[in-house]
């Protein structure tokens, strides 16, 4: 995947609030790296654009030779659901569904049968050590369990890229460490590209490559 000269700004009164200022980035197959920066640096906005959750004001975005910015919103939604997974600081699980049903959602949105979706979801919950929590609703799960369910949901369609935005930011230090270990295990076993956005220097420096962002630009 490649982002070229990405600019993003928002109207603010009589002026513009510039968030990203000509950022370029390549994501290679199976690569893992962290994007490190303080709050407001622009790192989450970049992740949202790379993940096609938002569009830039200017720039180019390609994946496997396809011009993602030329796609319609419906085309992008289908592409995103099949090729990308997302984990956020907050789990965003649906309270009316149990853990198994939450993990099944991307498969059902993608048109897969209930049988196939259930098989995939059960396999991932077992991998996450949550097979015995499959029937529990979000209000019956701990913070670490909620995040592991969210990670399973992000992986259920076997994406090529996993984007994670402050995935340990809402967890205590012990649980955070366990989730960090899980990400590295997933990267190796599932052979996916992993992009982590964080302000946690300790977490970031565990990656072989770290990009530092400040004021919407890369720091040299």
Swiss-Prot record:
A single cellular component GO annotation: plasma membrane
Topology in membrane: Peripheral membrane protein
PROSITE patterns assigned to the protein according to its UniProt record, in alphabetical order: ABC_TRANSPORTER_1, ABC_TRANSPORTER_2, LOLD
Localization per Swiss-Prot or TrEMBL: Cell inner membrane
Family per similarity comment: Belongs to the ABC transporter superfamily. Lipoprotein translocase (TC 3.A.1.125) family.
Lineage of the species this protein comes from: Bacteria, Pseudomonadati, Bdellovibrionota, Bdellovibrionia, Bdellovibrionales
Gene3D superfamilies: P-loop containing nucleotide triphosphate hydrolases
Keyword Membrane: yes
Top EC class, one word: translocase
Assembly: The complex is composed of two ATP-binding proteins (LolD) and two transmembrane proteins (LolC and LolE).
Protein's job: Part of the ABC transporter complex LolCDE involved in the translocation of mature outer membrane-directed lipoproteins, from the inner membrane to the periplasmic chaperone, LolA. Responsible for the formation of the LolA-lipoprotein complex in an ATP-dependent manner.
E.C. number(s) listed in UniProt: 7.6.2.-
Gene name as annotated: lolD
GO MF annotation list: ATP binding; ATP hydrolysis activity; transmembrane transporter activity
Keyword terms: ATP-binding, Cell inner membrane, Cell membrane, Membrane, Nucleotide-binding, Translocase, Transport
One Pfam family hit: ABC_tran
Positions annotated to bind ATP: 37-44
Protein name per UniProt: Lipoprotein-releasing system ATP-binding protein LolD
Domain ABC transporter, residue spans: 1-220
């Amino acid at each position: 995947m490649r982002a070229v000269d990405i600019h993003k700004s928002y109207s603010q009164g009589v002026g513009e609030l510039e968030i990203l200022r000509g950022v370029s980035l390549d994501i290679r197959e199976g690569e893992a790296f962290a994007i490190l920066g303080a709050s407001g640096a622009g790192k989450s906005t970049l992740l949202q654009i790379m993940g096609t959750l938002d569009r830039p004001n200017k720039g180019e975005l390609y994946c496997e030779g396809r011009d993602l910015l030329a796609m319609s919103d419906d085309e992008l939604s289908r592409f995103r659901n099949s090729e990308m997974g997302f984990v956020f600081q907050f789990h965003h699980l649906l309270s009316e569904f149990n853990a198994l049903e939450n993990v099944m959602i991307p498969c059902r949105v993608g048109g897969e049968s209930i049988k196939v979706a259930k098989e995939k979801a059960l396999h991932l919950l077992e991998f996450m050590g949550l097979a015995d929590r499959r029937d529990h609703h979000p209000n019956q799960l701990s913070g670490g369990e909620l995040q592991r369910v969210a990670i399973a949901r992000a992986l259920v369609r076997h994406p090529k890229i996993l984007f994670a935005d402050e995935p340990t930011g809402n967890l205590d230090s012990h649980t955070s460490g366990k989730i960090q270990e899980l990400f590295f295990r997933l990267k190796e076993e599932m052979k996916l590209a992993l992009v982590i956005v964080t302000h946690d220097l300790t977490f970031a420096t565990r990656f072989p490559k770290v990009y530092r962002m400040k004021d919407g630009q890369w720091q040299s």
